[in-house]
Amino acid sequence: MTILIIPQDPSENGNPAVDTIPPLLFPRLKNSYSRRAARLRQLAAKNPLGDYLRFAAVIASAQEIVLYDHPLRMDPRARLEESARSGRPPLDINTLPRDAHWQRLLHSLIAELKPDMSGQALSVLENLEKSSSVELEAMAGALFSNEFSQVSSDKAPFIWAALSIYWAQMAALIPGKAYVKAGEQRQFCPVCGSVPVSSMIHVDGVRYLHCNLCESEWHVADAKCSNCEQTRDLHHWSLDSAAVKAESCGDCGTWLKRLYQEKDPAVEAVADDLATLILDARMEQEGFARSSLNPFLFPGE
């Protein structure tokens, strides 16, 4: 059983029980994208992939603007009730109907980004701008179904950026309307069903996986593989960054990055993952498959 998000009776005040370790942290959207952009720019200064990190920072900055220009108004209680009945995440990417809001976010994002783009990136934005609603829906559906060959890798980050704002806005509306019940099988986000981008080791040593879509974080015991939950044959790998390591599992053959706030309080789930691709290459050489997905780095066609 995964982490369950259960509708809260209006007469209830808070959770029925308080866990020592909160199993789920919903997104705190205030300045979240601007913090990511700042971290990307900081990491770009001494990184061989600096140009791409700065490109990602421009997108993150635009996400911050679009987030506040297009607030979302919805009552999540119906989704929470359906989730309780079905056992699926309330914002399940495989079943939740997408309304027109996410495409408005995308077009606003494109308008915000075009003045800062040139060359191939500008051509991609102009192409997306001309895409029909049906075409955009098809691309979103393909990304959510892991059919990455159906969406060019240069379009995917822009589409995902808009979808991420939409899902994060929905997720941020859940606190106060539900309580969380801990469970097992936590390799997928309990809020939306997407995969993590990396794991954050908080200052107190508690590990949370950070969703690559809705920006929620969920707790996974540190002694378990974040993908298959086995406890044997786990190994940590690092190169030149003490704050970033990779955890591999010999049972399922996957790996996921671990970002340590104690080593560097500024670590950010998406930015630090993207800035340490040399570690990805090492893990691939060792024969392990990545169990996560960075929103700025999609598999090629």
From Swiss-Prot:
It comes from the Bacteria. One of its GO terms (molecular function) is ferric iron binding. Keywords: Cytoplasm. Its main location: cytoplasm. One of its GO terms (cellular component) is cytosol. GO terms for biological process: protein maturation. Necessary for formate dehydrogenase activity. Belongs to the FdhE family. This is Protein FdhE homolog. It comes from Erwinia tasmaniensis (strain DSM 17950 / CFBP 7177 / CIP 109463 / NCPPB 4357 / Et1/99).
